């Protein structure tokens, strides 16, 4: 190795130029509070409630030569531990189940998206909201 190359390598490594940033640029995968909506077409009202969901950044990779190799599965922020809570929609007619169950995130992890328990789609054009008149303000954490 030439003197100039050695000097450049020493400067790069000595000044920390080859190190990754110390803190994340985006929030990592973790439980966060979110307001969701619950409704049933047979019941007269919709309820908005606050619960904890998994959200945040998961490190991912994209192949430089995508045609040569199969795609790399991209991890998503998903539940590690969860519990289920439920709310009762008021004013439902007899014979209609007024209970709506939903997951409450206790801890999260980066992993494959499981369609059985997660919505693996991208951002929505419109946030989830009530189509019916709603009763706001329930909190489930």
UniProtKB/Swiss-Prot annotation:
Localization of this protein: Secreted
Statement: the UniProt record of this protein carries the keyword Glycoprotein: yes
Disulfide bridge map: 29-77, 43-92, 46-130, 54-108, 58-110, 113-120
Keywords, sorted A to Z: Disulfide bond, Glycoprotein, Hormone, Secreted, Signal
Keyword Transferase part of the UniProt annotation: no
PROSITE patterns attached to this UniProt entry: GLYCO_HORMONE_BETA_1 (PS00261), GLYCO_HORMONE_BETA_2 (PS00689)
Gene3D superfamilies: Cystine-knot cytokines (2.10.90.10)
One cellular component (GO) term of this entry: cytoplasm
Glycosylation sites recorded in the entry for this protein: 33
CDD domains associated with the record: GHB_like
UniProt superkingdom: Eukaryota
SUPFAM superfamilies found in the cross-reference section: Cystine-knot cytokines
Family annotation (Pfam families): Cys_knot (PF00007)
Protein's GO biological process: G protein-coupled receptor signaling pathway
Signal peptide (from-to): 1-18
GO MF term set: hormone activity
Function per UniProt: Promotes spermatogenesis and ovulation by stimulating the testes and ovaries to synthesize steroids.
Oligomer status and interactors: Heterodimer of a common alpha chain and a unique beta chain which confers biological specificity to thyrotropin, lutropin, follitropin and gonadotropin.
Family of this protein: Belongs to the glycoprotein hormones subunit beta family.
UniProt-listed PANTHER family: GLYCOPROTEIN HORMONE BETA CHAIN, LUTROPIN SUBUNIT BETA
Protein name as catalogued: Lutropin subunit beta
Name of the gene this protein is made from: LHB
């Amino acid at each position: 190795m030439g003197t100039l190359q050695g000097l450049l390598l020493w400067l790069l490594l000595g000044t920390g130029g080859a190190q990754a940033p110390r803190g994340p640029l985006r929030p990592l995968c973790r439980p966060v509070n979110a307001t969701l909506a619950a409704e049933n077409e047979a019941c007269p009202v919709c309820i908005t409630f606050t619960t904890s969901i998994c959200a945040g950044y998961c490190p991912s990779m994209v192949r430089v030569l995508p045609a040569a190799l199969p795609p790399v599965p991209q991890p998503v922020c998903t539940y590690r531990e969860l519990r289920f809570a439920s709310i009762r929609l008021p004013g439902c007619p007899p014979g209609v189940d007024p209970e709506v169950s939903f997951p409450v995130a206790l801890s999260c992890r980066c992993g494959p998206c499981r369609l059985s328990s997660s919505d693996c789609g991208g951002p929505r054009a419109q946030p989830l909201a009530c189509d019916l008149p709603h009763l706001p303000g329930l909190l489930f954490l």
